[in-house]
């Protein structure tokens, strides 16, 4: 029998799309016990395999921060980029904030939302998190298997 000392580690996501890929790969490799296969350029290929095989749960670990300008206002008083934002407002796994002082919407979501809804074009608005984004973190917990299967009630 091996005694496991409980611990945790906060995983910061690196910048850009490559950072999203690396975060997803790291979580997936821990899950599949293949951390030794991580290389400097293995992340994108790993993510593509997860998508192809339908293992979307790993994609949730890749945080996507978008910064979308309001755009131009039409004669009905609606902004040109509003349809892009509304789909995230309607998505339960995304958080939309706005700042009327600088005319931007700030969206926090995850890569699974982007892939499963075929919103890949929205990555043109990819940015680093700002003070206006809802912040997401990934925490790696090490604990006894029995503890990991318990339901905790606050």
Give the residues covered by each predicted segment.
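A conserved ligand/cofactor-binding region detector
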Residues: 1-154
């Amino acid at each position: 029998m091996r005694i496991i000392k409980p611990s945790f580690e906060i995983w910061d996501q690196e910048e850009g799309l490559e950072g999203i890929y690396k975060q997803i790969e790291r979580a997936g490799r821990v899950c599949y016990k293949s951390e030794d296969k991580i290389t400097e350029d293995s992340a994108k290929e790993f993510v593509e395999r997860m998508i192809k095989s339908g293992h979307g749960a790993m994609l949730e670990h890749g945080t996507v921060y978008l910064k979308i300008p309001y755009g131009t206002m039409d004669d009905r008083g609606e902004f040109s980029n509003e349809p892009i934002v509304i789909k995230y407002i309607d998505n339960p796994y995304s958080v939309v904030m706005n700042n009327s002082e600088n005319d931007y919407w700030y969206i926090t979501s995850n890569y699974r939302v982007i892939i499963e809804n075929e919103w890949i074009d929205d990555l043109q608005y990819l940015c680093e998190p700002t003070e206006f984004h809802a912040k997401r973190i990934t925490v790696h917990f090490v604990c006894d298997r029995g503890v990991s299967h318990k339901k905790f009630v606050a």
